[in-house]
């Protein structure tokens, strides 16, 4: 059979939930919504104030810290991402690739990865604020990540960007300067990808 044995396709395989994918999914989602923050009509300080006054964010951040403790104590990072005997010969998104490029030491890679998980959750919370529809949609992507193997950046490429724009288009103010920064962000990403795979 050509079906990936690690992908959950039947009810009796639910014990194979890939909980570690929640962190990697968050980095992929955050990567695509980060440049959209520059398009907000209101300044960043306004949204920062909303972020810190929203009690729901503290719940999400607390859950993310609990998740980090769970992953740190249960994930064999070397087996999962190490160059030798790894479950992943590809995938895991930009955070994994950047960690490989900048850190030879596996412990530093692991530290960088977990910090990236946490920062990504903060970015996502900052973006969605109190919007229930946004929360539900992004929750859908997190749930999907539990079933997929391998989890790859391509799964989130255009879908996340278009979804985020459609959800908050009324709160965006687009001009040439902001558009230039936006395209520069993804152009840098494209160049980096080309260099990585050369």
Please provide the spans of the model-predicted regions.
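Membrane-interface alpha helices of multi-pass inner-membrane proteins
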Residues: 1, 139-147
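Membrane-lumen/periplasm interface segments of specific transmembrane helices
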Residues: 1-95, 192-197
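Hydrophobic/aromatic-rich transmembrane helices and adjacent perimembrane loops
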Residues: 20-32, 93-121, 151-171
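Membrane-interface junctions at the ends of membrane-embedded or membrane-associated helices
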Residues: 37-50, 121-132, 167-184, 198
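Signature aromatic-anchored transmembrane alpha helix within multi-pass, membrane-resident enzymes
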Residues: 52-67, 131-142, 172-197
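Flexible internal linker/loop segments at domain or repeat junctions
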Residues: 69-140
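Membrane helix-loop boundary segments at the extracytoplasmic
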Residues: 147-155, 192-198
């Amino acid at each position: 059979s050509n079906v990936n044995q690690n992908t959950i396709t039947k009810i009796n395989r639910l014990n194979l939930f890939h909980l570690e994918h929640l962190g990697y999914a968050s980095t992929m989602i955050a990567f695509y919504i980060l440049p959209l923050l520059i398009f907000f009509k209101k300044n960043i300080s306004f949204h920062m104030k909303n972020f810190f006054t929203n009690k729901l964010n503290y719940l999400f951040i607390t859950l993310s810290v609990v998740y980090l403790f769970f992953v740190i104590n249960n994930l064999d990072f070397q087996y999962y991402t190490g160059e030798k005997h790894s479950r992943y010969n590809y995938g895991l998104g930009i955070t994994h690739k950047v960690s490989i490029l900048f850190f030879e030491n596996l412990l530093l890679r692991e530290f960088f990865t977990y910090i990236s998980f946490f920062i990504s959750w903060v970015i996502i919370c900052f973006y969605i604020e109190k919007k229930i529809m946004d929360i539900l949609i992004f929750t859908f992507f997190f749930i999907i990540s539990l079933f997929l193997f391998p989890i790859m950046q391509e799964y989130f490429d255009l879908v996340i960007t278009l979804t985020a724009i459609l959800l908050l288009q009324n709160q965006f103010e687009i001009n040439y300067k902001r558009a230039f920064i936006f395209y520069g962000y993804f152009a840098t990403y494209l160049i980096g990808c080309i260099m990585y795979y050369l």
